[in-house]
Amino acid sequence: MKELMRNVYLLDDTLVTKSKYGSHYGEKVFDGYREWVPWRSKLAAMILKGHRLKLRGDERVLYLGAASGTTVSHLADIVDEGIIYAVEYSAKPFEKLLELVRERNNIIPLLFDASKPWKYSGIVEKVDLIYQDIAQKNQIEILKANAEFFLKEKGEVVIMVKARSIDSTAEPEEVFKSVLKEMEGDFKIVKHGSLMPYHRDHIFIHAYRF
């Protein structure tokens, strides 16, 4: 077993997180380790592509676009001594997210529109990391707005960008260049890269706030 980052390992060729919990989305469980499926989680894909985050485990994380909690569940395994504010706007996936929250004490579910951070500003404290996976045209505006409200100075962001959600007619590479340029004024880019073969026409961007 090879350790990749806090509570994240390669078990033979399978990515897993160390966990005291059972399966959340049908993933396999191996004696205290949960399979982390890269085709179901862009963060898992990023890690398998070779980029890792240096997390202590006690961070406060704002997760924008939590959906039904697939990636949230693994991130909660990693920051097991911290807190994840999980924001999701759609009611149906939020119901599944609530199932996860019932057995975890480090996830706070928030049924809000991530483009309106002022609506949950009375709940969310300053965070060390913003993780965003929102397939909307204005996703960089959403990231900047939330960073302004919640991200600590020199806090980190990880955003998953789907080219077709921003401009379905442009070449993905042109969309990605535009997104990176849009981020430059507010963030220092640490690393960006493709999520192929796991997610087509997607990139990850890891950055920190000036």
From Swiss-Prot:
InterPro entries named in the record: Fibrillarin, Fibrillarin_CS, SAM-dependent_MTases_sf
Record: residues binding S-adenosyl-L-methionine: 70-71, 88-89, 113-114, 133-136
Pfam family, one: Fibrillarin
A single GO molecular function term of this UniProt record: RNA binding
SUPFAM superfamilies: S-adenosyl-L-methionine-dependent methyltransferases
UniProt keyword RNA-binding, yes or no: yes
Keywords noted in UniProt: Methyltransferase, RNA-binding, rRNA processing, Transferase, tRNA processing
GO biological process: box C/D sno(s)RNA 3'-end processing; tRNA processing
E.C. code: 2.1.1.-
Keyword presence, rRNA processing: yes
Subunit structure: Interacts with nop5. Component of box C/D small ribonucleoprotein (sRNP) particles that contain rpl7ae, FlpA and nop5, plus a guide RNA.
Record function comment: Involved in pre-rRNA and tRNA processing. Utilizes the methyl donor S-adenosyl-L-methionine to catalyze the site-specific 2'-hydroxyl methylation of ribose moieties in rRNA and tRNA. Site specificity is provided by a guide RNA that base pairs with the substrate. Methylation occurs at a characteristic distance from the sequence involved in base pairing with the guide RNA.
HAMAP family per UniProt: RNA_methyltransf_FlpA
Protein family according to the UniProt entry: Belongs to the methyltransferase superfamily. Fibrillarin family.
UniProt name for this protein: Fibrillarin-like rRNA/tRNA 2'-O-methyltransferase
Source taxonomy: Archaea, Methanobacteriati, Methanobacteriota, Archaeoglobi, Archaeoglobales
Gene name linked to the record: flpA
